[in-house]
Amino acid sequence: NETDTNPITYFAGDPEEWFCFPCKVGKLLCFVYFNAKYTASALSMANLFELATKEEANQKPDLILLFGNPDGKNATEFYYDETENIWLGCISDDPRIEYFGYLKKMCLTLHNLAAMQQGWLPIHGAFVNITLNDGRKKGIMLMGDSGAGKSESIEALKSVGKDVIKDIEVVFDDMGTIHIEDGIPYGQGTEIGAFIRLDDLDPG
């Protein structure tokens, strides 16, 4: 839910028990602040989001997330700081949030809010660039709800098209954006990794 109060103002944690995970969500710099007890979940983000460089970590972020704020609100909220031009998210401390998905989804929510602010279209789907044996290149985008089979369709495409497809480059596999430059649509991903159900893959 959107809030009209900056979450930083009601941060209730002990700074000595909190850490920052600076990462890139797409092209945006995100600082994820988390309580030490959620270290396992927070560090798992390294599988999906690129770790910011030392130089980037010293810059002003585009996004800020407070994960596990002991504010007693039992809420998941986001806020836009117009003065600083930063999107902020806050997830209240609760045993239920010990789930990596809460971290990932809030990071993506903040990214999507910032993307829409630029006029970009967030897409829940998959986008691939295909190079055929004759040199032609095509882009294919698949959209659908969770579990619809987007990732599995890409794997199936690799199998059934192996005689005509030279290479498949995955641009994004879960969440990305589409934007227009000089009248041409471009796709951009948010993550460097992806989750896939092993039982949906062919052996080998």
Which ranges hold each PLM region?
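Glycine-rich phosphate-binding P-loop
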Residues: 132-163
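Generic detector of intrinsically disordered, low-complexity, polar/charged segments
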Residues: 65, 116, 144-146, 173
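A noncatalytic interaction/capping subdomain that flanks phosphate/NTP-handling catalytic cores
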Residues: 1-139, 179-204
